[in-house]
């Protein structure tokens, strides 16, 4: 096998054209084996194999700098740059991340995981090169939906003025995570249909030179194209037409399903570990919203390129029709659009992963909350037990969203409470509202939840009234609070009060004052970073009093590829550890 002899780009350059084709197939086979056993981004990487081989054949990495957008399509790059063991040896699978990582290799220049940043980053590298009088090619590899993000437009706009070497490889696989949306992609389609000859050309209109490669999975065609632009003295876009999922029939046929996958059976494509029949908040949310859409044509679902985050499968998107909008990977636009829909009398619901809502902070503040428009944002997967890559942490949404004036950020503890908050959030007309969807499974508390959270603004629920110690368990950590209260009583006899705060954004001053009468310690629990979070609001309120406060959450750091249980233990977020601490300070 040729792949066994590849320890770096220099080894790729020694191969003949025919050998490069064989190498590409070997790389694809290695990728499929690891992906089926370990999981990861399937379609994006299978479609980029030939382009990656050609890049390392023509260019001279790391002297020539290649920046991969999102870098979820960099697996073949890692194989060819000395990290093949992590793809061929099951014992080493976890030795590399799923994204570019400079600590792994000199061929990686940035830790990247969010979209549409490659052109901006590469523009910076090119500018630094020019300022120092250096040489070498700078290449941004972007595609798989990333061009729909606003920063990509900003980067291209600036790149056109560089006047020096700058190459953008546009991986056009006609897909994002789901299907592409927007006028840009109609132009890419026109360029494909005319072999790049259409006079209406987005890239030349932006001021870049342009080259089209009809078969972006043909190694020799790619080599020829890359040779034409190597050492070019001005910005150029190389538009390559690729097939997402190339070489694996099921991934070619089910491109959305195989964008990313947990371990799966190669023969059938079925997940190796069954997901069971457990309820899922995304699925339940889509069913509920479709019912609301049928009753009220002003209800509209919005996604920024991740429709299944709240259960909108292709069939459900079709059923929703004009009442579902995929804006592309453009969270900023999604929030501003939702604000304006609400201002115009509509009922927008924007579903988004916790890790991606931070991309729209300015729009949350300026376009939504300053205008006080009643849009609803559903924040999924917030907490330590969801995504664990350093680029996709879901630990920061509480301080990000929870400190913006006018925002009402809710933290339901169970299924009943979530749907009550969802219904109120859609139909109320007074506040921008966000809901932190529980991330610990669909649980029932068997309660009759409140209906009007506007009348109850910043009023906490006392789930159990005791004394001496009060435990405030926020959202997904309410159940941890139940464990703490139970264990504390078991070990000390103290019957602690258990509180469901419900509101991340507000303080129930009346309740906190009342707790002073017969409590000496308040414990706060939140599934997110402590700094700037919910617990600090409680500690600040009690600061001048004699009340002791213990805040529990995740310390402020960029944890990477952690084990959730270990992270919780490291932050003393188990019932056993919390009770130990309570006994020490009482």
Regions found by a protein language model. Name each.
Residues 1-79, 215:
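N-terminal amphipathic, basic-rich helices that act as targeting or association modules
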Residues 86-96, 161-175, 369-381:
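A glycine-rich helix N-cap at a beta->alpha junction
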Residues 39-48, 67-72, 100-120, 142-146, ...:
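Active-site nucleophile and cofactor-binding loops and adjacent substrate-binding regions
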Residues 65, 248-358, 363-373, 472-475:
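Non-catalytic terminal/interface segments that mediate subunit docking, oligomerization
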Residues 73, 108-265, 270-278, 282-283, ...:
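Glycine-rich ThDP/TPP pyrophosphate-binding loop and its adjacent helix/strand module
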Residues 272-273, 386-388, 408, 529, ...:
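Peripheral docking tails and interdomain loops at the edges
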Residues 29-36, 97-111, 133-139, 313-328, ...:
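Glycine/charged-rich beta-loop-alpha catalytic/anionic-binding loops adjacent to active sites
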Residues 41-162, 299, 304, 313-314:
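Cofactor-binding active-site loop characterized by glycine-rich and histidine/acidic residues
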